Amino acid sequence: MKLPIYLDYAATTPVDPRVAEKMFQYMTMDGIFGNPASRSHRYGWQAEEAVDIARNQVADLINADHREIVFTSGATESNNLAIKGVAHFYNKKGKHIITSKTEHKAVLDTCRQLEREGFEVTYLEPASNGIIPMERLEAAMRDDTILVSIMHVNNEIGVIHDIDAIGELCRSKGIIFHMDAAQSAGKLPIDVQATKVDLISISGHKMYGPKGIGALYVRRKPRIRLEAQMHGGGHERGMRSGTLPTHQIVGLGEAAAIAKAEMATDNERIGRLRDKLWNGIKHIEETYINGDLTQRFCGSLNVSFNYVEGESLMMALKDLAVSSGSACTSASLEPSYVLRALGLNDEMAHSSIRFSIGRFTTEEEIDHAIETITQSIDKLREMSPLWEMFKDGIDLNQVQWAHH
């Protein structure tokens, strides 16, 4: 067993060896290294064919048409292109956008930028289970609303939104629906023929593909128009200029094909391991799960251990690669804005750990994790005066702390 045990699959996934092997065939002089836009010789044609195959593989994953897939550098760029692209193209129709307070920073900061440009954004509060109630979404809709951007699976707490219902509501009001599927593409079934979603952001490195590659699904019927955010040679039907990185695109395609074929068996095993982990630690006193218990992705577990300081817990769990909050914001000492939006106080938000399980997690690793967590919590609480006061029946909210 390799230490530390990797339980941070929501931050990134290792590249599947089958994907890496395929990618290597598209880099060197011995392989297919040409520019897919070189139309005058075989090197270019072969690269273009590889890109076409990968585009079809990504399209198949979500049951889309290959012409609806635009390659980007990742989900952050896809989110930017979708939200800014729609806002700039449809701004004559309206300047109101709806999103939620628990979105990824790539969505929130893009919306903040649009606010500076004169757009109005409504940030919806989730319920305490982390899910946006449909009535709140409907109540926020106005005649000048042009876009709703709601994530499929939350990156910190793993809750799943009812995208079918959101899609129906948006379509009935003539509002474009963008979904950030960084955490769900390749892990949960998505069918654009069945779900009325107009734009989908996809990330390669969240589904055992390489970092630095992603895609944006852009619906053709009814047709969604975008204003490009990256200008140049007019690649990707004018929506995203820049030479296509063949090896990364091939990697994304292969990862998508593997995910589609193995999703059901992967999820069954991952779900079993997650339940084993939760059943192994839920007996620890004052331990709470964050986010809805049933409407959640099988690989995700966000747990608060009350009366334990999150940072010291992270240090104690040095044999486990886990995170507090998302990787994109965990470097800051601010408590998770996602957990705060659920109504957790600073202390509870600070004492939370995100465990995320994936394709290469083993039973043995979960057993070791349970043991490590249990021992660490016991040890840290032994040293904690707050825990002692709590055990003595003192209500810590009533304590008057001396100010220095």
UniProtKB/Swiss-Prot annotation:
Which EC numbers does the record give? 2.8.1.7
Per UniProt, the keywords (alphabetical) are: 2Fe-2S, Cytoplasm, Iron, Iron-sulfur, Metal-binding, Pyridoxal phosphate, Transferase
- Show the active-site residues: C328
SUPFAM superfamilies linked to this entry: PLP-dependent transferases
Q: What's the superkingdom here? A: Bacteria
The answer on whether this UniProt entry bears the keyword Cell membrane reads no
Q: Where does pyridoxal 5'-phosphate bind?
A: A75, T76, N155, Q183, S203, G204, H205, T243
List locations, semicolon-separated.
Cytoplasm
Q: Name one GO molecular function term.
A: metal ion binding
Keyword Iron-sulfur in annotation: yes
Q: Name one GO biological process term.
A: [2Fe-2S] cluster assembly
Chief location of this protein within or outside the cell: cytoplasm
Query: How is this protein organized at the quaternary level?
Result: Homodimer. Forms a heterotetramer with IscU, interacts with other sulfur acceptors.
What is the name listed in the Swiss-Prot or TrEMBL entry for this protein?
A: Cysteine desulfurase IscS
Organism of origin is Shewanella sp. (strain W3-18-1)
The gene for this chain is iscS
